[in-house]
Design a protein with these regions (language model features):
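TPR alpha-solenoid repeat register
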Residues: 61, 95, 129, 162, ...
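Eukaryotic alpha-helical solenoid repeat scaffolds
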Residues: 158-334
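Canonical tetratricopeptide repeat
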Residues: 64-67, 97-98, 132, 165, ...
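Structural motif corresponding to the intra-repeat A-B loop/turn of tetratricopeptide repeats
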Residues: 38, 72, 106, 139-140, ...
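Canonical positions in the second alpha-helix
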Residues: 50-51, 84-85, 118-119, 151-152, ...
């Protein structure tokens, strides 16, 4: 009887200790996160190691420890820490991104490619992993890179960086459509992003490239119905470009394009064009086009436009801040 009571006492003490340890591990983890935010990775490593000792199966702690080693440029330790995470049932696509950053810093390109392919096999709908794999193979195989970025757009249409890379890739090819489509989608997904000003310039140049030919459909070899419909509709606006391309002309061309696109119910549904239609109806389409092209094409003219259209610009800016652009999963046409 005494033995049984002793055993029960030990069990009770163990059960009481376990939650305390778990809580302590979480408290330590939060402390370490504060150090990470401050850029104090030495202290973060110190605290995370203690936290992981209490909760060795906590993959979130292990990921942060690997990242802290990475930022300290202790890549061997970082790799040792992240590898068990990759093989665990709790691995997520972020785990593979962290490991990828470590392999990049170690300049182990072959391992990097294998890692991302392994990650995609486990997470076939991860836009970030397709994007990273595309960037990893770009130097050796641009064709493979664009395939991965396209797959990323198809699998995870809400992730922006595949659009960015794909738009830049197509700009340096004979393609006339997808730089414009993907570039504008990226800008709407990241309206204040660091890459957005450069993408706006690419978009402006892409429209100039599009209207170089008098007949936009003439040399089109793409049998894609979306592309054919796009070029056919845009071709009707070619005469408007006789005086060149600028923000005002593009606003006119694109307004007419949207009206024509929605004139019948035969064109494919497309979120970007639906946004254009909404802005037209609400009287903000010119403000949107000025935001998209104005500052890039002529900064002083854009600043003057903002002054003379203050109410329109304010209304658009408020809308821009309140919305989030996300492409639907069923509107991939390439």
């Amino acid at each position: 009887m005494i033995k049984k009571l002793f055993a029960l006492s030990i069990l009770a003490v163990t059960l009481l200790i376990q939650p305390t340890h778990a809580q302590s591990a979480e408290q330590l983890h939060q402390t370490a996160k504060s150090f990470m935010k401050q850029g104090d990775y030495a202290n973060a490593v110190l605290v995370l190691n203690k936290s992981l000792q209490i909760a060795p199966d906590n993959m979130s702690i292990a990921k942060d420890l690997a990242m802290s080693y990475y930022f300290q440029k202790d890549n061997i330790k970082a790799l040792e820490t992240i590898k068990p995470v990759l093989d665990s049932k709790d691995a997520d696509d972020q785990s593979f991104q962290i490991a990828g950053n470590i392999y990049k810093q170690l300049d182990q390109r072959n391992e990097l490619e294998k890692l991302y392919k392994k990650g995609i096999k486990k997470f076939p709908e991860s836009g970030p992993l397709y994007n990273e794999l595309g960037e990893a193979v770009f130097t050796n195989s641009k064709l493979d890179a664009i395939k991965y970025w396209e797959k990323g757009i198809q699998a995870d249409p809400g992730y922006s960086k595949n659009y960015n890379n794909a738009a830049r890739y197509y700009f340096f090819t004979t393609d006339k459509v997808w730089t414009i489509i993907y570039g504008e989608m990226f800008v709407n997904m990241e309206p204040t992003g660091n890459s957005t000003p450069e993408m706006k310039q690419i978009l402006l140049d892409a429209y100039k490239k599009l209207f170089t030919e008098n007949d936009l459909e003439k040399n089109n070899k793409d049998k894609n119905n979306f592309v054919k419909s796009y070029l056919e509709t845009m071709n009707k606006q070619a005469a408007v470009t006789n005086a060149g391309i600028n923000a005002e002309v593009l606003s006119m061309i694109r307004a007419r394009f949207v009206i024509d696109w929605f004139a019948t119910n035969t064109k494919p549904a497309f979120k970007l064009f639906s946004l254009h239609q909404q802005l037209l109806k609400e009287g903000m389409f010119e403000a949107y086009n000025q935001w998209l092209f104005g500052a890039t094409e002529n900064l002083s003219a854009y600043e003057n436009w903002v002054k003379t259209h203050a109410a329109e610009n304010t209304a658009f800016t408020a809308l821009q801040k309140s919305r989030m652009f996300k492409a639907p999963a069923d509107q991939y046409y390439h």
